[in-house]
Amino acid sequence: MTRAVHRAGFRPLAFASRHLLLRPAALKIAASIVLTLLALGLYSLSRGSYPLPASTLVRALLAPQEMGEQPRFILFDIRLPRILMALLCGAMLGLAGAAMQSITRNGLADPGLIGVKEGASIVVLALVLFFPAVGLVWRPLAGMVGGIAVALLVLTLARDCSRPRFILIGIGVSWSLAAAVGIFMTTADVRDVQTAMIWLAGSLQAATWPLLAVAFCWALPGAIILFCTARAADVALLGDRTAVGLGVRLQQLTVLRFFAPVLLTSASVSCVGSLGFVGLMAPHMARFVLRGGQVSLLCGSALIGALLVLATDTLGRLAFAPLQIPAGIVIALVGCPFFVVLLWRRRDAL
């Protein structure tokens, strides 16, 4: 068995009494993505309307107490929370997309395409417009309620999450909820609408340390669920009968891996608005560059999702300065053609 594994190009990695089979090439690619994230993050930290030279940036990170008040505020209260929020939300959406595509066995599946984002958005928007005194910590909870409600509605109408019509029904529900969001926007106060429009476009400019902490607290359970059920998900891909014969509890697995992406997506939408197509693109890119099982797919999707959001946010912030284009708009410009190509390639299955 060990010789066969080595001949296949895998290397066993022991961790906490478990063994994962990883390709050395995949490890190198993952390491290169991490280095790219680090380099892009440092570049984003140093660029903006108030540029920070490399020497000043390094000194600020090592000894922040020696900085002036203005550069310290810009670096630690504006740019750093924004970059970390981009990384976190991108990773959350990448994980959500990978899990949704796995459980539905459909490469077109994405929580954003089945109305989860719109469900979370409409509840959070109602909370912001009509109950502005509600604390920030309750927004992800409200978004999660909306996202789960929409997911249950789509699942009930489609009857089976593995059928192609699950995606089509989700798109229809998503458009209906988008119309409801438009009704909210036309009846609310103009000042509130302006703020809501920036948030709905997927802007990270309002990222703060408290908001980042809230997002992390809601993201952690979803990520833990997905990684803990990754091995069972690999077995489930062999077929229902085989999985049951090997001891996989399919019903519990389906419930966990269906609602974990809903939790991750709802938390992301509640904090930074809609970042479309990240959950659709990241898993496909991860499969192409990393390959392997669910653990490899989840890790790759999280890294690539983080890279997509950070890159598009940096581009939208710097390319047209002083005008800042929300990351959600930049991602949509890339994601729409990507979705059309996927739809065309899978047209016979729909």
Identify what each model region corresponds to:
Residues 2-350:
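Alpha-helical transmembrane segments in inner-membrane proteins
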